[in-house]
From Swiss-Prot:
This is Small ribosomal subunit protein uS3. NCBIfam families: rpsC_bact. CDD domains: KH-II_30S_S3 (cd02412). The gene is rpsC. It comes from Salinispora tropica (strain ATCC BAA-916 / DSM 44818 / JCM 13857 / NBRC 105044 / CNB-440). Residues 209-288 are annotated as: Disordered. Belongs to the universal ribosomal protein uS3 family.
C-alpha cells in the first residue's frame, strides 16, 4: 500500500500534520470548499513564486493563512502591495479577518513540491525528461538532510505515441515505513503533446519523537569472553564416562596380553581371563 496511497495522508498523526487546522459542525462543507478555493487561488495567481504549501488555521472570527514560498519577494511585492492585494481577496472570499504570514523555504532544492514544479517547468521548456530528472536528483542529494529521492514522470514522454511511466531513484525511499519522514510533491507539465505528471518523493530520515532509529540506538554491551583455560569445562552427558571407561579397558587389555606374551612356555594362561579383562570396562572415579 505504500506505493499506492498518498504519503501525506498515510502518515497523518505519525510523522506529518494536517494542512488545515479547524473544527466545524454544520459549516464543515463550507470550510472545506473555502480551503480548496484559497489553495487554487494561490496556485494559479502565483505560479512564479514557488509556493510549497499553504497552511490554513481558523478561529471564530479570524483566518490565518501561512504561505510557504521559495521567493517571498514575489508574494510580498513592492512595499507590500501584492500581500495587501492577496489579503483583500482572502477577506472577500472568507468574510472574516485574514492574517497572512509569508514563510520562506530555506532549501528549495530538497522540497518535494518545489522539485516537482521545477522538473515540470523544464519539461514545458522542451528539456529532455531524463536530463531534468537527473539534475533535480543531483541537486537534492547535495543537501545532507535528504537521505533519498525518487522522481517519476508519466505521459507522452518525448512526444511518443503511447504514454508510459519512468522513474529514477537514488538513496533510500521507504514508502511502507510509517515513521519515515517522506515529503511528496506533484505537479503537471503542459506540453504540446499533452500533460505530463511529475511525482517526487523525498526521504528525510525518521521523524517519530522518542523513538531511536537503528543507526542512533546504542549498541548492546558485549560480554567479554575469558580465556579458554578459565572457563569451566562442560562434559557431554552420558559420553564422558563411557569414553574414559573404554580407554581404561583398552589399556588393561593391552597390559594383560603383554604379560601373557612374557609368560614362559611351560606355564598355561587362562584365555577366558584375558578375554574378560579385554572386554570389561574399567571403573572410573569422578572427583566431586
Amino acid at each position: 500500500m505504500g506505493q499506492k496511497v498518498h504519503p501525506h495522508g498515510f502518515r497523518l498523526g505519525i510523522s506529518t500534520d494536517w494542512k488545515s487546522r479547524w473544527f466545524a459542525d454544520k459549516l464543515y462543507k463550507d470550510y472545506v470548499g473555502e480551503d480548496v478555493k484559497i489553495r487554487r487561488m494561490m496556485s494559479k495567481g502565483l505560479e512564479r513564486a514557488g509556493i510549497s504549501k499553504v497552511d490554513i488555521e481558523r478561529t471564530r472570527d479570524r483566518v490565518r493563512v501561512d504561505i510557504h514560498t521559495a521567493r517571498p519577494g514575489i508574494v510580498i511585492g513592492r512595499k507590500g502591495a501584492e500581500a495587501d492585494r492577496i489579503r483583500g481577496k482572502l477577506e472577500k472570499l472568507t468574510g472574516k479577518q485574514v492574517q497572512l504570514n509569508i514563510i520562506e523555504v530555506k532549501s528549495p532544492e530538497s522540497d518535494a513540491q518545489l522539485v516537482a514544479q521545477g522538473v515540470a517547468e523544464q519539461l514545458s521548456s522542451r528539456v529532455s525528461f531524463r536530463r531534468a530528472m537527473r539534475k533535480a536528483m543531483q541537486s537534492a542529494m547535495k543537501n545532507p538532510v535528504c537521505k533519498g529521492i525518487r522522481v517519476q514522470v508519466s505521459g507522452r514522454l518525448g512526444g511518443a505515441e503511447m504514454s508510459r511511466t519512468e522513474f529514477y531513484r537514488e538513496g533510500r525511499v521507504p514508502l511502507h515505513t510509517l515513521r519515515a519522514n517522506i515529503e511528496y510533491g506533484f505537479f503537471e507539465a503542459r506540453t504540446t503533446f499533452g500533460r505530463i505528471g511529475v511525482k517526487v518523493w523525498i526521504y528525510k530520515g525518521d521523524a517519530v519523537p522518542g523513538r531511536e532509529t537503528p543507526a542512533e540506538a546504542p549498541s548492546r554491551p558485549r560480554r567479554e569472553r575469558g580465556d579458554r583455560s578459565e572457563r569451566p569445562r562442560r562434559g557431554r552427558s552420558g559420553s564422558s564416562g563411557t569414553t574414559a571407561g573404554g580407554t581404561e579397558a583398552g589399556r588393561a587389555a593391552a597390559t594383560t596380553i603383554a604379560q601373557a606374551a612374557e609368560t614362559p612356555s611351560g606355564e598355561s594362561v587362562d584365555a577366558g581371563a584375558v578375554a574378560s579383562a579385554a572386554t570389561q570396562p574399567a571403573e572410573t572415579q569422578q572427583e566431586g
